[in-house]
Amino acid sequence: MKKIEGEGASQFTTSELCEKIGLSKGDNLLLFSKGRAEKTLEKSPYIASAKLSAKLPHTMKITIKERKARGYVPYMGSYLYIDEEGRVLEVAGSCRDALPLVKGLKFDSFTEGEILPVQNTDALAVILEISQLMEKYELLDEVVEIDVSKPKDIYAYVNQVQIHLGNMTNGDMKIQYMQQIVKTIPKEDRGILDLSGLDNPKANVTFQYLT
């Protein structure tokens, strides 16, 4: 083996992946246990799937499908990084990227790499739906906080604007409106954007400025 290629990984360098599975140049391309290496890599919460393929005459390719953090859940002074399934990817003392802080989930414990075992599963279902819609409309790096303490009366926060979503009836429309309206509001402006009325086709969207 003279060359090792990596594809699909942003959380890990190719060198880090090789270190995890004990792969190095000079190894026998055909005798290296690819299946065992794939299982080892998939133990990482960030790696959804791994595939090693030998490319003759002397190249090994590591293809990774990663899980992505979609939000942070505060927990005892730390933050749980969760993906779009509610899986705990990492526990850290700070938030690295611009992703929403998720409030309102109730749980007593967790296991890294597993789905967060919340008591209020309806709230988790709501946050997963919202995060997918916010990814669709490229809002994940804009939203500061999402509060699902009351799954039928949801609030989100962008800059100094409180956004009242209400429930997730017409959720796609609400998040689309949110994306369109928020970008027109100057960051220094304070106010309340009420999208909850979109449950009713005849209702209006309102914005109340706060001083």
Protein language model annotation of sequence segments:
Residues M1-A9:
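Aromatic-capped interface at the extracytoplasmic side
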Residues E7-G8, D27-F32:
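Short, surface-exposed ligand-recognition loops at beta-strand->loop->(often short) alpha-helix junctions
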Residues E16-N28, R36-K39, K43, S49-K51, ...:
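Charged, solvent-exposed interaction patches on well-folded alpha/beta domains
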